[in-house]
From Swiss-Prot:
Organism of origin: Pyrobaculum aerophilum (strain ATCC 51768 / DSM 7523 / JCM 9630 / CIP 104966 / NBRC 100827 / IM2)
Subunit structure: Homodimer or homotetramer.
Name by which UniProt lists this protein: Polyamine aminopropyltransferase
A Gene Ontology biological process term: polyamine biosynthetic process
Residue numbers binding spermidine: 67, 91
Enzyme type, top EC level: transferase
Disulfide bond positions: none
Main location: cytoplasm
Amino acid sequence: MSKVPGPIVLMEPLSGKTSLIIKINAIHVSKRSKYQGILIVDTDDYGRTLVLDDYIQSSYYDEIYYHESLVHPAVTTHPRPSDVLILGGGEGATLREVLKHNTVKRAVMVDIDGDVVELSKKYLPQMHQGAFDDPRSEVRIEDGFVYVENALKRGEKFDVVIMDLTDPYSSDIAKQLYTPEFFGKVKRLLREDGIVVTQAGNSFYFPEAYDYVLQGVKGNFPIIAEYSVWIPSFGYAVNFVLGSLKHDPHSLSAEEVDKRLSERGVRAEFYSGKTHIALMNMPVIKKILRV
């Protein structure tokens, strides 16, 4: 660990013209992998933070809002989620949340960057909380696109696919995983009542990228849910798009959500029946241009 002797700050770009400035107290990791720049630092306001290619991915103090919102609406909406595929999510927090559901028998996490996974195991224990060692976990270091294509050839099937990738506009690593064609492959990988959910960046600063992801999901799934949640360390509300082949997350009551969470032994800090209803009724925030 390198202590920061003077004021060093991270400037995270929110858009091409706006940045979030964050004071760094200590640097644990600063390196470039084969695929991206990796930074793990300590900050006052957000705690230990993972940064990839200058974009914050997760921070100790607020990561639950992102990961619980990404995972639980989809997994809870499915009545019997047994097999779950996670694309991305190298720090292990998405895997952690998936494994809270005792119905899950197999959770496959596929991340292209093995350095992120190994560094997260060492420096981000509060995020993964031992999820990598759970006997239900299967961690694969490979391109998510290639994994999905090969899984289709093998005849694999999943109940839920969770896409916890870098933003569609932040780097080139995951761009091909946001295309309509790829969502079509995901649809084929799902069982007949399967669900996919993806983070979709920010609809305010990058409306075109968000709409591209949304239309890709809409073109392949009959049931759609759009929702968002404010993430302080991101400096914006992150958007999510859920696509379902049968089960509608809007149809669940708060009581039914709480019942499923209780029956499955899920202990969440943010997500609940009331939170589910709120998320499903959250408007998508976009710029309102007045001339």
